Swiss-Prot record:
Region (Golgi-targeting domain): 519-631
A GO BP annotation: Golgi organization
PANTHER family: GOLGIN SUBFAMILY A MEMBER 8B (PTHR10881:SF63), GOLGIN SUBFAMILY A MEMBER-RELATED (PTHR10881)
Region described as Disordered: 1-103, 127-154, 426-447, 488-520
Compartmental location: Golgi apparatus, Golgi stack membrane
Keywords: Coiled coil, Golgi apparatus, Membrane
Coiled coil: 110-468
Entry protein name: Golgin subfamily A member 8A
Gene name of this polypeptide: GOLGA8A
Record's compositionally biased regions (Gly residues): 497-510
Membrane-protein topology: Peripheral membrane protein
Segments of skewed composition (Low complexity): 78-92
Cellular component annotations (GO), alphabetically ordered: cis-Golgi network; cytosol; Golgi apparatus; Golgi cis cisterna; Golgi cisterna membrane
Pfam families: GM130_C, GOLGA2L5
Organism annotation: Homo sapiens
Amino acid sequence: MLPVDGEERKSEGSDTEGDRTSPCAVSSATLKDLEVGGSGRRCSDPAGQPSNLLPQRGLGAPLPAETAHTQPSPNDRSLYLSPKSSSASSSLHARQSPCQEQAAVLNSRSIKISRLNDTIKSLKQQKKQVEHQLEEEKKANNEKQKAERELEGQIQRLNTEKKKLNTDLYHMKHSLRYFEEESKDLAGRLQRSSQRIGELEWSLCAVAATQKKKPDGFSSRSKALLKRQLEQSIREQILLKGHVTQLKESLKEVQLERDQYAEQIKGERAQWQQRMRKMSQEVCTLKEEKKHDTHRVEELERSLSRLKNQMAEPLPPDAPAVSSEVELQDLRKELERVAGELQAQVENNQCISLLNRGQKERLREQEERLQEQQERLREREKRLQQLAEPQSDLEELKHENKSALQLEQQVKELQEKLGQVMETLTSAEKEPEAAVPASGTGGESSGLMDLLEEKADLREHVEKLELGFIQYRRERCHQKVHRLLTEPGDSAKDASPGGGHHQAGPGQGGEEGEAAGAAGDGVAACGSYSEGHGKFLAAARNPAAEPSPGAPAPQELGAADKHGDLCEASLTNSVEPAQGEAREGSSQDNPTAQPVVQLLGEMQDHQEHPGLGSNCCVPCFCWAWLPRRRR
């Protein structure tokens, strides 16, 4: 019975020991349950079976099989103590290993969370930097757009100033041509006045010779007339010289103004070229900045892709805590927001690049337009230079035509004088012998002989003048027509003998049409002059068919002699008093001085009633030229 009591006591001791060890087991179990966090796992052995090592309060631990078959000694306490201590140590080791693993996992997760927080902070800083850079780029783009708009306005202003200067140059060229025409007219007038002075001197010599022979006649009257004529011619020459000097001064002033305009245009062109160079440099800088922005955007996209890849990487198998998942979701949202902002910035950059492309295309179009305008201006200058030569030739033709009209008027006047001499001869033959002086003097016979000699001399002089004039006119007309036909351009095509009423076609400019019309006028004038000279020669060879001095002049020279007929009518109206005086003197004195007096009276009347080029306004031959230019 003693062993039984010992066993009972041992069982009670074991129970007490189990009760003593049970709080540790309970505390370890509660720790394990708290660490797992409701995962539903229980402590198990390596085989997966639940362990029965945990002691139960009030129950003894089972003994091994060896002790179950053998009878233990009552004094052997190791049988009761060793199995319990070994099971407690193994359970403690098994409980400590998952706690350490969970602590390591928690440490790694805290490190990852700190790293993610650092990356979030760096991304926020990068975002702020990118926003600041984008704002600066927007400001720079706005400033560049303002500068481009200002440059476009300046280019438009320069274009308007260039147009104004071109119009001013055109008007200056027109005024220069008019002044040149007027100077040529004045030079012709000077030449004619010098010729008239020579004729007057020659007539004075003739009058002096006649006065030596017969000083009883109209010497005092002729001397007074000659003195008046000389004084008037000298005054006219002085006035013409003064007018020529004024015209030369005006031409110099106009040339100086033209040079000033040319210098201004050159300076403005240089300024415009400098501005265009600056624009090209700014465009190059914009391209470089655009490339830099594209590289920056690519780098940001790469960084975003890396962050997305990092976020897309799978997490470790251990389940994260609730707080880390919330933070990760916030991080993902922030990353998505940053990605959206970056995409918006990329779109803005693309829009800015498109605007820059449009502005570059506009600048290229403006440069092309400016180059086309410069080419057109050069072509116009070349055309004007080409057209200036035929216009000068046509002006020379017109001046020569005017001088030819004057020569024809002189020839007509000489013919009228011949008719008057013939009338005086016939009247002298019909006079009775009572009116003749005493016989033996030989006055009338000598007068008749002188008249016949003067008539023959006048006819020879007229024929020589006609032949020389016709030859000269034919040569000049052939030369001018050959020049007009052989010159390049459209002026030779329109130089038809149909007249000068040509207008500029759709492919020609105003100046080309004017030159073509002027060429047609010159050719038509040459044809009309050749016909008129043929008829004039026929009339000169048949003096019987000439009209009387009082009758109006026949219109035989065509449309080209209309201005000459008008001038002749004014001159014949003014010559009548001088002719009356000469007839009175011829009835009293020698009739040989009658043509000289008529010539002097005609010169005086011509000076009292000036013809072409006497006024400062446009000459009369230009009135047919100006309306065509105004078309």
